[in-house]
Amino acid sequence: LMNNLNKHTEYLNSKDKHIEYLNNKVYFTKDNRLLTPNAQPVMMGWEDPIMKDAASLICHNKGKILNVGFGLGLIDTYIQSHQVQEHWIIEAHPDVQNKMKNDGWGKKSNVTCLFNKWQNVYDELPKFDGIYFDTWKESLDLFHKIVPNLLKPGGKYTYWSPNDLEVHSVFKTNEYKVENGITKLDYISSNQKYYNISKDLFNYKLITKKL
């Protein structure tokens, strides 16, 4: 019971922080950082090599790809380099949406931009060959519950979060994995320079749906 209460409290705290984030401005800096008004990092340019690896994973068959949370657009730029069939982006923050519009993301022939919270549009989404999820200060628990419904057979899903215990809670039980055909694999960036960053700080993982 206490574990359930603690999880519920963590979820509510995460929800409050995410709402606060969406209601405040963010700033894009010249040195490729995305910051909150009090200079908290939302996304940093040094994440680039990890985003490159993540894009390679989800673009495994150059099919239909979804990214939730645009940020600096690092992974979306790499997704475009794979010349995928369809590239969907969900972004909820108004300032990031404006940056995307100014940079012409909505004009790319294979890109569909959904300027909304994922909770408002997920039931209208098609199935994808690859999915990446990285929103700021938001619990991933709810999104992870719908991942199996959004993936095609053989599809791959990656995410990046500093709160590993909360993030992986949905996937801990064998019953869940058997029911949804999920195989969980540890994944660390192939770039040795970022090995310790991704392993120790972010616990970066790959989850792939079986054929």
Predicted features, each with a name:
Residues F70, E91-P94:
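Short beta->alpha hinge that forms the Motif I/post-I loop of the SAM-binding pocket
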Residues E86-E91, Y159:
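Conserved SAM-binding motif I beta-strand of class I
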Residues L72, V111-D164:
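Active-site segment flanking the S-adenosylmethionine/decSAM binding pocket
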Residues K99-V111:
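Short, conserved SAM-binding/catalytic segment
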Residues K15-K62:
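Class I SAM-dependent methyltransferase Rossmann-like catalytic core
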Residues N61-G73:
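Conserved class I S-adenosyl-L-methionine
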Residues V96-Q97, S139-L211:
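C-terminal substrate-binding/active-site "lid" region of AdoMet-derived donor-dependent transferases
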Residues L72-V84:
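Conserved SAM-binding loop of SAM-dependent methyltransferases across substrates and taxa
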